[in-house]
Amino acid sequence: MEGDGSDLEPPDAGDDSKSENGENAPIYCICRKPDINCFMIGCDNCNEWFHGDCIRITEKMAKAIREWYCRECREKDPKLEIRYRHKKCRERDGSERAGSEPRDEGGGRKRPASDPELQRRAGSGTGVGAMLARGSASPHKSSPQPLVATPSQHHHQQQQQQQQQIKRSARMCGECEACRRTEDCGHCDFCRDMKKFGGPNKIRQKCRLRQCQLRARESYKYFPSSLSPVTPSEALPRPRRPPPTQQQPQQSQKLGRIREDEGTVLSSVVKEPPEATATPEPLSDEDLALDPDLYQDFCAGAFDDHGLPWMSDAEESPFLDPALRKRAVKVKHVKRREKKSEKKKEERYKRHRQKQKHKDKWKHPERADAKDPASLPQCLGPGCVRAAQPGSKYCSDDCGMKLAANRIYEILPQRIQQWQQSPCIAEEHGKKLLERIRREQQSARTRLQEMERRFHELEAIILRAKQQAVREDEENNENDSDDTDLQIFCVSCGHPINPRVALRHMERCYAKYESQTSFGSMYPTRIEGATRLFCDVYNPQSKTYCKRLQVLCPEHSRDPKVPADEVCGCPLVRDVFELTGDFCRLPKRQCNRHYCWEKLRRAEVDLERVRVWYKLDELFEQERNVRTAMTNRAGLLALMLHQTIQHDPLTTDLRSSADR
């Protein structure tokens, strides 16, 4: 049907001898030119190809055409009609109904009389739109009186029926002020019906200020208050239910007059007698005998400001003017892309409104009940007769402070007297707990002094050991006693090693793995009288202080270089714990039994000192908590909130005999 130069069908058998170059090239279209470098569309009857520019059809418009026939074929055979593609229905049974429903002259699907969408619109509308919708929704129930129409009016009705098949997205020109508007006014009847403005969402129409001024239905457009004293929905006639025998001719004549005077429909409606604009009663399908064609003309938006439909040419009506169609489709696509973002904006706007209402409620509490001041309770302040503020029991802060002061003066003396008369068991328990904490603190301080003494003794032993002389005979005896065939495995890396160098290897392997982990705190350690505890080296990247023991930190300290003539100096022991008073006099580089013995002894003493300091800190925290509880127990707030009831006034001491 459609295509460009590559989609052209081969010429007939009679043209095989013709060359495509020069004068013998095949010619196409009504212009009879051989040009094939532009968009072309082919007739599905005569297989003739036409240029889109010559017949005013663009490539985008051709995508919506299913079957296209040229004008000559349509004049020869009136049964040939251009058919268009339609979107699939979103309902589950849309595909089943599409094949069974009849199609109209333009190839579109006809709306049945019982279409639920039509019934919904007819049920929710008001005025003439609701009357016409109800009348056309059930033509089999009513017997409408035929209207006398001239041939020109009959042709006009056919045009309006074709206009009704145009998609609703084509009701936007994209140029007027209403089409360019992006926000709803929030004041018209359509906006008040929306959920985001607190409505029931029954009408489901766009804001009246956003209805296109050229293509929208006249009943949906915005009518300024200066032109009409009533709203657009109220301007349309709302007749009462007429009797079935007498009012039917008048009803059809009235609608016939509206049909003839389409251009001035609103002015004629305003001049209706008072009976036509009275309060309407519920209408049924049997009550109204209306012309379905009149309803189609009304829904298609045929009543514009000039009394003429916005599409007058019957051949251009199915696919619109190319420029206007392009703008309308562009606006539609932009709206589809912004659909999700608009939903998010609406949700965000709802949350913002809720938060704003909550803030206004607390910032301006007097606004909540300003309409009904008599419903506010009286202020509870002493001697105050004013109304309390919304959300409060008092009219001002002064009244609340006065009442609180009176309560203290009235209740506190009696509570103090009760506290002094009966001893408090919790107070006595607190005193006992304080005594126990103080004893533990004293023992911890004694332990800390002992560890300080051991610290200084160790430093003296290390200093005296360094003064010993090296003996070579002990080195030879050690080498002879070692077993070279025995192997053990490292506890850190698992490699097999010789027992002679096991301690040296394990110490270095441990330092390598330990340096991969950091232990830090945000604050340095400050302990009075304590030396050489934590490393406390600041790390600028993590902004922490290292909390390893200073003598064992492999990350920020290294073992000093040992000279060749330095003695080992490790104190020798008997039966593991009993000191002999002698020292190891092997060279420090060659002694494998006492590798880094100074560092390990210092770490042992420092670790014990740290434990004692932690114990002291815990005891200080317990003492502070107990003292705080004892202070608050007899305070103003505690006495006002808590009370011990003595059921026997003669017995003031409530303790048991065991606790006394």
Curated annotation (Swiss-Prot):
What is one term from the GO cellular component aspect held by the record?
Answer: nucleus
Classification via SUPFAM superfamilies: FYVE/PHD zinc finger
Task: Spell out the subcellular localization from the entry.
Answer: Nucleus speckle; Nucleus
Gene Ontology terms: biological process: positive regulation of DNA-templated transcription
Q: Where is the composition biased (Basic residues)?
A: 328-338, 350-362
**Where are zinc fingers of the kind CXXC-type found along the chain?**
164-213
Specify which residues bind Zn(2+) 1 according to the UniProt entry for this protein: C173, C176, C179, C212
Summarize what gene deletion causes: Cxxc1 knockout male mice are fertile. In contrast Cxxc1 germ cell-specific knockout female mice are sterile.
- InterPro entries from the UniProt entry: CpG-bd_C, Spp1/CFP1, Zinc_finger_PHD-type_CS, Znf_CXXC, Znf_FYVE_PHD, Znf_PHD, Znf_PHD-finger, Znf_RING/FYVE/PHD
Q: Which residues carry this modification: N-acetylmethionine?
A: M1
The answer to keyword Metal-binding applying to this record is yes
Comp. bias intervals (Basic and acidic residues):
91-120, 339-349, 363-372
- Provide the positions where the record notes the PTM Phosphoserine: S6, S19, S124, S228
- ZnF locations on chain (PHD-type): 28-76
Region Disordered: what ranges?
1-20, 91-166, 223-287, 328-375
Composition bias, kind Acidic residues: at what positions? 1-14
User: What's in the keyword line of the UniProt record?
Assistant: Acetylation, Activator, Coiled coil, DNA-binding, Isopeptide bond, Metal-binding, Nucleus, Phosphoprotein, Transcription, Transcription regulation, Ubl conjugation, Zinc, Zinc-finger
Which residues are in coiled coils?
Answer: 426-479
What superkingdom heads the lineage? Eukaryota
Location of the Glycyl lysine isopeptide (Lys-Gly) (interchain with G-Cter in SUMO2) covalent cross-link?
K254
A single Gene Ontology molecular function, please? zinc ion binding
Q: Which positions does UniProt annotate for Zn(2+) 2 binding?
A: C185, C188, C191, C207
Q: How does it assemble?
A: Component of the SET1 complex, at least composed of the catalytic subunit (SETD1A or SETD1B), WDR5, WDR82, RBBP5, ASH2L/ASH2, CXXC1/CFP1, HCFC1 and DPY30. Interacts with SETD1A. Interacts with ZNF335. Interacts with PRDM9; this interaction does not link PRDM9-activated recombination hotspot sites with DSB machinery and is not required for the hotspot recognition pathway. Interacts with histone H3K4me3.
Name the UniProt record assigns to this protein: CXXC-type zinc finger protein 1
Instruction: Give the taxonomic lineage as stored in the record.
Output: Eukaryota, Metazoa, Chordata, Craniata, Vertebrata
